Amino acid sequence: MLEFFSRLSLVTKIIIAIILGIGVALLFPTVTPYLSLFGELFIKALKSVAPILVFVLVLSSIANFQVGHSANLRPVLLLYVVGMLLAAFSAVIASLSFPSTLYLNTVSHNNLQAPGSLADILKNLLLSFIANPVQAISEANFIGILAWAIGLGLAMRHSSDTTKQVMQDVSHAVSAIIHKVIAFAPVGIFGLVAVTFADAGLATLESYAQLLVVLLGTMLFVALVINPILVGLTIRGNPYPLVFKCLKESGITAFFTRSSAANIPVNLDLAERLGVNPSTASVSIPLGATVNMAGAAVTITVLTLATVHTLGIHVDLATMIILSVVATISACGASGVAGGSLLLIPVACSLFGISSEIAMQVVAVGMIISVLQDSTETALNSSTDVLFTAAVDIRSRQNS
């Protein structure tokens, strides 16, 4: 039995865990307090590994980042950044229009408040930026962690190849630990679902359903409205034939592989059939698999604002704009890690003074809905890589 279970994919295991958790909560509610340990251990493991993960991942990515010599790379990168920002803005609007409530353990956290003005926000950001790096990691100050990782990463771009390789090896090692933690997600989710449904009842299903609708609806809006507008402005023509071709041939594959990196060969093959210059595609598509994460920006923004709404924190327009930028930057570090966008939610939550403990509960909620969220997110991310690359190449041919 255990051997059969071990052969199942993580998605299948999570689905089974959710069904079992709901079943236990409805049939044996008195047992659920004993199952809470599984969820607590899972959240504790995520809390422990998240700070060092963000630090090492961002540092290594920047230290080893090399820009190619393709003349078309800059406009592709511009589309990547603009696309992610607009995706984050769309997520803000969707979250405000359809606010979601999460079931969180918020004991002693009911007095949280967002900064009152833009000056307060910038002051808090600056104070977080210049935090002691060791203290930032130990206290899970993700803004400080991000600042030190970016600074050290930029400095290490001029270091020897051996040093860069060491950083890359450390990054791979931390990622391996994350994979081990994620492997225990079904057990943790089983405990979390059982306790949540025993405490809140079937109303929890409605909450998760609304959250999923907001997430998936925003991603569809980005794929079918935002991206076509950007592509249409780029190629000065009807974008939808290209958009639908990329969604069909790249998005569907990415939906089931749930990995932008694994979908790179599919995108390169599609780019070749679309007649894209190989010197452009060979750089921009692998680069896009690393940094172009519009779906991740949506996930980070929606779940962060759902947390803010749950805690009753008031936010103004300036804070939301900063959140969109933070979500975009965080999304760039989401590649290559199972559940990467979910594990970077604490970075955005820290903007509102939300503790790491609550942020990790939100990550756990994200794990529960990740069966659909992660697949759709990857489909959007990966199809956008080849879409924007092809659009810039078409524009280049028009100008030549």
Swiss-Prot record:
UniProt-recorded Gene Ontology molecular function terms: amino acid transmembrane transporter activity; symporter activity
Pfam families: SDF
Swiss-Prot/TrEMBL catalytic activity: L-serine(in) + Na(+)(in) = L-serine(out) + Na(+)(out); L-threonine(in) + Na(+)(in) = L-threonine(out) + Na(+)(out)
Domain of life: Bacteria
GO cellular component annotations of the record: plasma membrane
Subcellular location: Cell inner membrane
Example GO biological process: threonine transport
Transmembrane annotation, as ranges: 14-34, 48-68, 76-96, 136-156, 177-197, 211-231, 285-305, 311-331, 349-371
HAMAP family: Ser_Thr_transp_SstT (MF_01582)
Task of the protein: Involved in the import of serine and threonine into the cell, with the concomitant import of sodium (symport system).
Entry similarity comment: Belongs to the dicarboxylate/amino acid:cation symporter (DAACS) (TC 2.A.23) family.
Name of the protein this chain belongs to: Serine/threonine transporter SstT
